[in-house]
């Protein structure tokens, strides 16, 4: 059943004769169910022409001050003269515009610039799908997004003013919200075709996105007059190649007075010579996240690449030893590494290890069995004796928040080998065992002042346990609040950490070795070996 009614004929004939395609006509007539839009374009045009052939009265078009004045005004004057000689007093729509309705299938829509014509047909859908299949991405669903030229909003505004005026003659109204949005109509037509061609559902929450960007160089200046009338709407923004974004154009159209618009832009809009061009067809997959715990056994390995003034100081890092394997297997473009704290280059991380997470950006492969992840973990562990990884698993973006939760409240356990300048006996260190929840103030250490703001941070040493080695050495086991600088707690950092081991013992103390024994974060979940 054809979706238009007798009430729509006036508007449909008007739009068709001024160069508007059938699908845009449906939009302006408020057709909000999908089926009619999905008909093949030629069939749709034939059905529309059949529907309009039953119209008995010619429609009157009152052209609203179009800029290409000389051509169209001359056409109108000639039409009026011819009609007056025949004793008729009305202007036929068929005399206005460059195209009669029967030839509309040869012309580009003056509103959508071909978007709802050529780019809704199966040939174009197949072209996009071929690009998707050649991209090499794994996906079980997709979200399809399009970017239309901003001048489409200007053209739609002009067509709306035209239709609104004509409907006003019949005491009818047409609000902007009554028009079906171009993107909505485009989705109604294309989504089922994409889903059928690729064999997967269209899902707005899918991590795999196919995006198509359209442009129309021929009409790119359609928006420019708005900048002169509404300059506040068009301000340069970072990462934007043009000030004429869709949002800026819509803001200006909502602000501009109708009479000002009509002085500057043809109504109805001119028919273009060519359809839109496809600037790009891109595929991208949302990031996936891998988490685990790592042990670091080397005292000559930084957590992240150590590069100063463009020069690499050490050949590798914990981050690289793990991420290189993940990048290769997930076929990702890049990654972001994060962890629950960090250790210095000369500090080992023992026990159950330190929690970490890696964000893999735009991965092409995303589906793995638990066995495949276990094999990947083994591959990482076999590749180096400097680190080991455990509990490797895929996690969600939201789950990574657990790693950072309670950053100040969580605790860490350390083991340090201490040197003292004065000779000591076992009894000289035993009093440290009795100290509980010692509060200290730490001014930002000198060694990190270049990358951390100057501040005094209150920290807590929950307990200490000593182990005598010889008259100048003892081992100190301690549990502290996360974020405590252990080296500075031992040597005092020139008095910037108070109290410290040196001040408590009334000696000069320094730290020779430091190991992280545990990071007390219950994440990620432990896995069976």
Curated annotation (Swiss-Prot):
This is tRNA pseudouridine synthase Pus10. Changing residue 484 to I: In a colorectal cancer sample; somatic mutation. The lineage of its organism: Eukaryota, Metazoa, Chordata, Craniata, Vertebrata. The keyword Transit peptide does not apply. Belongs to the pseudouridine synthase Pus10 family. Residues 304-317 are annotated as: RNA binding forefinger loop. Protein with different functions depending on its subcellular location: involved in miRNA processing in the nucleus and acts as a tRNA pseudouridylate synthase in the cytoplasm. In the cytoplasm, acts as a pseudouridylate synthase by catalyzing synthesis of pseudouridine(54) and pseudouridine(55) from uracil-54 and uracil-55, respectively, in the psi GC loop of a subset of tRNAs. tRNA pseudouridylate synthase activity is enhanced by the presence of 1-methyladenosine at position 53-61 of tRNAs. Does not show tRNA pseudouridylate synthase activity in the nucleus. Zn(2+) binds at residues 21, 24, 109, 112. Interacts with components of the microprocessor complex DROSHA and DGCR8. Its EC number is 5.4.99.25. The gene is PUS10. GO terms for molecular function: metal ion binding; primary miRNA binding; pseudouridine synthase activity; tRNA pseudouridine synthase activity; tRNA pseudouridine(55) synthase activity. Transmembrane segments: none annotated. Residues 42-89 form a coiled coil. It catalyses: uridine(55) in tRNA = pseudouridine(55) in tRNA; uridine(54) in tRNA = pseudouridine(54) in tRNA. Residues 442-457 are annotated as: RNA binding thumb loop. Gene3D superfamilies: 1.10.10.2050, 3.30.70.2510, 3.30.70.3190. One of its GO terms (biological process) is primary miRNA processing. It is found in: Nucleus; Cytoplasm; Mitochondrion.
């Amino acid at each position: 059943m054809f979706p238009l009614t007798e009430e729509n004929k006036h508007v449909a004939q008007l739009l068709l004769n001024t160069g508007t395609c059938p699908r845009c006509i449906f939009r302006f007539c408020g057709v909000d169910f999908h089926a009619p839009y999905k008909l093949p374009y030629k069939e749709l045009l034939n059905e529309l022409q059949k529907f309009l052939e039953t119209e008995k009265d010619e429609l009157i078009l009152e052209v609203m001050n179009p800029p290409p004045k000389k051509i169209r005004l001359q056409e109108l004057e000639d039409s009026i003269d011819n009609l007056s000689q025949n004793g008729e007093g009305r202007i036929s729509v068929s005399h206005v515009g460059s195209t009669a309705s029967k030839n509309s299938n040869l012309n580009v829509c003056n509103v959508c610039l071909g978007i709802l014509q050529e780019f809704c047909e199966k040939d174009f859908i197949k072209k996009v799908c071929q690009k998707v299949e050649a991209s090499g991405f794994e996906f079980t669903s997709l979200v399809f997004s399009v970017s239309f030229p901003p001048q489409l909003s200007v053209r739609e505004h002009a067509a709306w003013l035209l239709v609104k005026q004509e409907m006003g003659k019949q005491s009818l109204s047409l609000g902007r919200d009554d028009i079906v949005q171009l993107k909505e109509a485009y989705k109604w037509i294309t989504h089922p075709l994409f889903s059928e061609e690729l064999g997967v559902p269209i899902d707005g929450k899918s991590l795999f996105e196919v995006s198509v960007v359209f442009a129309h160089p021929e009409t790119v200046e359609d928006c420019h007059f708005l900048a002169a009338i509404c300059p506040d709407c068009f301000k340069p923004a970072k990462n934007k190649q043009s000030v004429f974004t869709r949002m800026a154009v819509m803001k200006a159209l909502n602000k501009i007075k109708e009479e000002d618009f009509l002085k500057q832009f043809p109504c109805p809009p001119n028919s273009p010579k060519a359809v839109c061009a496809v600037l790009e067809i891109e595929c991208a997959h949302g990031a996936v996240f891998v988490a685990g715990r790592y042990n670091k056994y080397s005292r000559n390995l930084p957590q992240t690449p150590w590069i100063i003034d463009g020069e690499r100081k050490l050949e590798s890092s914990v981050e690289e030893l793990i991420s290189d394997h993940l990048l290769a297997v997930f076929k990702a473009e890049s990654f972001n590494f994060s962890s629950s704290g960090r250790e210095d280059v000369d500090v080992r991380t023992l026990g159950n290890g330190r929690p970490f997470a890696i964000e893999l950006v735009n991965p092409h492969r995303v589906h793995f069995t638990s066995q495949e992840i276990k094999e990947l973990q083994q591959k990482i562990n076999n590749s180096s004796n400097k680190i080991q990884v455990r509990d490797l698993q895929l996690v969600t973006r939201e789950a990574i928040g657990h790693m950072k939760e309670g950053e100040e409240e969580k605790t860490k356990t350390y083991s340090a080998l201490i040197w003292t300048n004065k000779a000591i006996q076992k009894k000289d260190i035993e009093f440290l065992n009795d100290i509980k929840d010692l509060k200290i103030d730490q001014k930002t250490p000198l060694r990190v002042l270049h990358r951390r703001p100057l501040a005094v941070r209150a920290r807590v040493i929950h307990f200490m346990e000593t182990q005598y080695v010889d008259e100048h050495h003892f081992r100190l086991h301690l549990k502290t609040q996360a974020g405590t600088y252990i080296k500075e707690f031992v040597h005092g950092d020139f008095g910037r950490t108070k109290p410290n081991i040196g001040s408590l013992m009334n000696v000069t103390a320094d730290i020779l070795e430091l190991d992280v024994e545990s990071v007390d974060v219950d994440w990620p979940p432990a896995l069976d070996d």
